[in-house]
C-alpha cells in the first residue's frame, strides 16, 4: 500500500536488489526484468526492470527488516515467503474489520472480508491520483510500462518520485481521502 508492488515482488524481494542513493539519504530497489516470481517463470509483469521507490513508511519497514536475512528482505523460516494471501492475511482482515467496527460503532464494510493483496497496489495508485501525482509519475511508481520512463534516473528524478510516494504516506494524516462511489441498484 506504500510502494505499489505486486505480491511476489514483496515476497521475493532481495537485499542485493537494493541500491543506495546517498545524495538523498535513502535507497531504492531495482527488481531485475528476469525476476521469476512465484513459479520462477512469471517475471516482472511488463518485462522491464522494476524500480521500487520507498516512501517514509516503506523505508521504516525495510529498515526494521535489516539483519533478519542476508538474502531476503522478508524471510520466512530462512527463505523467501511463498505468498502473502494466506490464513494470516485472512485473520488480519477479520481483526481489522473488528477494530474498525469497535472504533466506528457500526459494522465494517463487507469488502473488508475480501480485500486481496493486489488491492493494496490499486489503493496506492488511487491515493497517488487523489494527491495530484502526474500520470507519468504514477506509472513509474506502480511499475507500469511507460515508453518515456527508463531504469536510469537522476538523483533529482528519484527525489521527485520519493516526494510523490510520500504524498500518500500512511503516517501523514493530511493525505488524500478517497470516497468510494457506487450506483444504487434499481
Where on the chain are the PLM-derived regions?
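Conserved tyrosine-mediated DNA breakage-rejoining catalytic core shared by Y-recombinases
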Residues: 3, 8, 12-64
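Short, polar N-cap/turn motifs at the start of nucleic acid-interacting alpha helices
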Residues: 16-26, 114, 133-152, 176-177, ...
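Conserved beta-strand positions that form and line the central face of beta-propeller blades
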Residues: 30, 73, 116-119, 152
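Residue-level marker of regulatory loop/turn positions in helix-turn-helix DNA-binding domains and
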Residues: 43, 109, 113, 117-118, ...
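Active-site/catalytic core of tyrosine-dependent DNA strand-transfer enzymes
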Residues: 53-112, 186
Amino acid at each position: 500500500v506504500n510502494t505499489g508492488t505486486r505480491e511476489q515482488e514483496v515476497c521475493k524481494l532481495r537485499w542485493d536488489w537494493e541500491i543506495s542513493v546517498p545524495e538523498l539519504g535513502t535507497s531504492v530497489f531495482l527488481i531485475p526484468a528476469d525476476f521469476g516470481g512465484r513459479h520462477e517463470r512469471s517475471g516482472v509483469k511488463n518485462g522491464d526492470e522494476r524500480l521500487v521507490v520507498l516512501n517514509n513508511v516503506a523505508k521504516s519497514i525495510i529498515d526494521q527488516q535489516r539483519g533478519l536475512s542476508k538474502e531476503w528482505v522478508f524471510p520466512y523460516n530462512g527463505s523467501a515467503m511463498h505468498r502473502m494471501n494466506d490464513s494470516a492475511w485472512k485473520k488480519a482482515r477479520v481483526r481489522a474489520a473488528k477494530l474498525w467496527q469497535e472504533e466506528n460503532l457500526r459494522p465494517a464494510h463487507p469488502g473488508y472480508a475480501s480485500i486481496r493483496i493486489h488491492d493494496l497496489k490499486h489503493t496506492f495508485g488511487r491515493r497517488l491520483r487523489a494527491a495530484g501525482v502526474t500520470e507519468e509519475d504514477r506509472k513509474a511508481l506502480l511499475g507500469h510500462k511507460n515508453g518515456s520512463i527508463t531504469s536510469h534516473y537522476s538523483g533529482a528524478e528519484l527525489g521527485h518520485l520519493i516526494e510523490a510516494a510520500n504524498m500518500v504516506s500512511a503516517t501523514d494524516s493530511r493525505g488524500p481521502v478517497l470516497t468510494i462511489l457506487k450506483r444504487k441498484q434499481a
